[in-house]
Amino acid sequence: MAEFVMRDLAAKWRAERGAAADIEFEIASAATSTEQLGNEVYPGTRRKLAEHGIGCAGKRARQMNRGDYARYDYLIGMDSLNRRDMTRICGGDPEGKIHLLLDFTGQKRDVADPWYTDDFETTWNDVLAGCTALLAKLTGG
């Protein structure tokens, strides 16, 4: 969900600024485990994104790898288990690139996980708040 929310917010930010938008974004997501590799976006997530006019067609889960640490400026996890696994996969975090999404909101907690609760609305709210705060940090806004 976060990949597509962030893409949507970044596209809107860029559209509002036109030629003045001098920041390039490369936004992607990857799993920290092998459980969902190759799967499409979870149906509940697809529905919630569609409610907000955001598509996710063609996305298939891939696993994060050590090369992602060199490729990206920020590596964002949804929960503390993600952060632990990301740090392990990357062999540490010497450049301080690994963060939790809600850290950017000042809330030191995990994004609500709809896997067991089926509460995609709470997850949407967490992801939107985190992505909005992250975009503001990246753009100085």
Predicted regions located by residue number:
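Conserved active-site segments centered on acidic
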Residues: 1-71, 136-141
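Small/polar loops that bind or transfer phosphate-bearing groups
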Residues: 29, 77-78
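Phosphate-binding/catalytic loops
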Residues: 68, 74, 80-141
